[in-house]
Regions:
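Metal-dependent de-N-acetylase/amidase catalytic core
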Residues: 3-19, 90, 101-172
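Active-site rim/loop-helix segments in enzyme catalytic domains that contact anionic ligands
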Residues: 6-118
């Protein structure tokens, strides 16, 4: 009986996954959607591929004695505070670097594992074309690819496959 109850609870859970190229992207590109869906009862998880430590932290780099680790720590705290302010369920950091963002097969499989774990009702990521930031375009491509892999019965067949959640694309 307990198992059946647990299964029912899991199927009624509403969740969403935000795939963000840089730690600050989710805040101003889909922060309103995150806050709204949390309020509607969704568990919104954010996954940041990088901290934006090279290309999106100019003010920090202008400070004396700045190091890559200090920038990453600062950006992580900022993103965690933003996620908390939006009432996000969880935030994850893959620390893949940026400018350029590079997402290899191992990192893609980590994203697939996260997608399968969350089983999102919908996903959000960057728009398909951003002439000013190729990291964002790569994130879109990877979001589409990892969603596809998460749906494949032959990829780690012992795991629960993903249904077919809609992928919404955001930009300011």
């Amino acid at each position: 009986i307990f198992f059946k109850t647990e299964s029912i609870i899991m199927t009624n859970k509403k969740s969403a996954l935000i795939l963000s190229a840089h730690a600050a992207d989710f805040v101003w590109r889909c922060g309103g959607a995150i806050a709204l869906h949390q309020k509607l009862g969704y568990e919104v998880t954010i996954a940041c591929m990088s901290y934006g430590e090279r290309g999106e932290s100019a003010k920090l780099w202008k400070q004396d004695g700045m190091t890559i680790e200090k920038v990453k720590n600062n950006r992580r705290k900022e993103a965690e505070n933003a996620a908390k302010a939006l009432n996000a369920h969880d935030i994850n950091f893959l620390d893949l670097g940026d400018y350029p963002l590079e997402i290899d097969k191992e990192a893609k499989y980590k994203i697939v594992d996260l997608i399968r774990k969350i089983q999102p009702n919908f996903m959000m990521s960057h728009s398909k074309y951003d002439q000013y930031n190729t990291d964002h375009m790569l994130m879109t491509k990877v979001a589409i690819e990892t969603r596809m892999i998460a749906q494949a019965w032959g990829h780690n067949p012992e795991e629960k496959v993903l249904g077919a959640p809609q992928l919404y694309l955001f930009e300011p």
